Amino acid sequence: MGTHVAPWKQLLFGAIEANSHLSHSSYVQLATIGLNGRPSNRTVVFRGFEENSDRIQINTDLRSRKIEELKHCPFSEMCWYFSDTWEQFRINGRIEVIDASNPDQTKLQQREKAWFANSLRSRLIYVCPTPGSPCNSEQSSQQVKLDPSSGPVPEYCLLLLEPEKVDYLNLKTNQRLFFSSMATGTGEKCWTSEKVNP
């Protein structure tokens, strides 16, 4: 029998709280499938959960390679290790990309809210030259500016990871739990959990 409440979220909130004194505790690895079929991985910042949802929010640049990869294949896995408590969360699911061209007004408002939740310094990276492009001396000496009250620039994207499977490992207690979601007959998400060998 499953539950509508994601049982792994309490474990994750506990790990976030217990490791909050570590500046790196909000950094997670996000893997996608490259256009060449090979793994592609990078570190991103956890920006919280979508309101009243299990969906994980991540900010990114529309010009980054991961956007093209996610448009080709929206499946992804996040790996999050908490070094003080020795806990690992592998969160597998589908990512929705919300950019300026999204036709849904509610999603555009969500994107704007996420934009303003970031510091001005974080927002400035979206007006810098294209990530991964060759660097020239003129670009590196230019000062980038952004009006703090202006809304999201076109390069800013909000990613929403919809968890489908969560693999939790606690190395201190030698405990491993596997959570998986499925849709009920009414279309609601339901979670099941299973204790497995570490």
UniProtKB/Swiss-Prot annotation:
Binding sites annotated in the UniProt record for FMN: R42, N59, T60, K66, R121, S122
Its EC number(s): 1.4.3.5
Cofactor note: Binds 1 FMN per subunit.
Entry's Gene Ontology molecular function annotations: FMN binding; pyridoxamine phosphate oxidase activity
Gene3D superfamilies given in the database record: Electron Transport, Fmn-binding Protein, Chain A
Keywords: Flavoprotein, FMN, Oxidoreductase, Pyridoxine biosynthesis
GO terms (BP aspect): pyridoxal 5'-phosphate salvage; pyridoxine biosynthetic process
InterPro entries: Pyridox_Oxase, Pyridox_Oxase_Alr4036_FMN-bd, Split_barrel_FMN-bd
Pathway(s) annotated for this protein in UniProt: Cofactor metabolism; pyridoxal 5'-phosphate salvage; pyridoxal 5'-phosphate from pyridoxamine 5'-phosphate: step 1/1; Cofactor metabolism; pyridoxal 5'-phosphate salvage; pyridoxal 5'-phosphate from pyridoxine 5'-phosphate: step 1/1
Reactions accelerated catalytically: pyridoxamine 5'-phosphate + O2 + H2O = pyridoxal 5'-phosphate + H2O2 + NH4(+); pyridoxine 5'-phosphate + O2 = pyridoxal 5'-phosphate + H2O2
Top-level taxon of the source organism: Eukaryota
Cofactor dependency: FMN
Described purpose of this protein according to its UniProt entry: Catalyzes the oxidation of either pyridoxine 5'-phosphate (PNP) or pyridoxamine 5'-phosphate (PMP) into pyridoxal 5'-phosphate (PLP). Has an in vitro catalytic efficiency for PNP approximately 300-fold lower than that of PPOX1.
Family of this protein: Belongs to the pyridoxamine 5'-phosphate oxidase family.
Quaternary structure (record): Homodimer.
Protein name, as recorded: Pyridoxine/pyridoxamine 5'-phosphate oxidase 2
Species per Swiss-Prot/TrEMBL record: Arabidopsis thaliana (Mouse-ear cress)
The gene coding this protein: PPOX2
